[in-house]
Amino acid sequence: MKSASAETGRLHLMNLTDWTAHTASGYAQAGIGILVRPSHKLCRLTFRADASYTFRHMIDTPSVPGTVPWSRACNRGTLRLVAQRVNPVTGAFETDLQRSVPLWADSAATGSTLFADGGHGTYPGADPGLSVLGGSADTFALWFIASVFVGKEDHYRTNRTICQANLDCAVPAMWVEQTPLS
């Protein structure tokens, strides 16, 4: 489940593995962005966002008989800044540059039972943002993206490993500074 609102600046993600499947994994992502056309012939664009976030995640790997090779699960959350530029030939946006800021990464193996954790914080902290070179002929889509990954592998028919990750973000402001280079 994922949602994003440019109007409110809120992002919400929830990702959960299918407990009936032996192997399952996937990403949930949501983002908000802005379109920018540089006002200088050549310049450095520095994209920044002001955000607060809260996360919760859980892994439950039940015990299995000693003859079973293993069962494991992992989850992680990240914030990403992404710059996409319009390709003048195709007219499509193409990813030019991205920066990932890890929030957490956890894993568990057979029989570790229920593990849950959470946290909160603010972005950018010490992160310098995302800088890209461009000019007045370019059009950029600059994105703030929240992403969670969950994955599991069960190797016993009755094992029901559960892996879940939730991430909520509030992004009240995003901005771009243009520094002329010509």
Which role does the model predict for each range below?
Residues M1-S182:
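Mature extracytoplasmic or otherwise solvent-exposed domains
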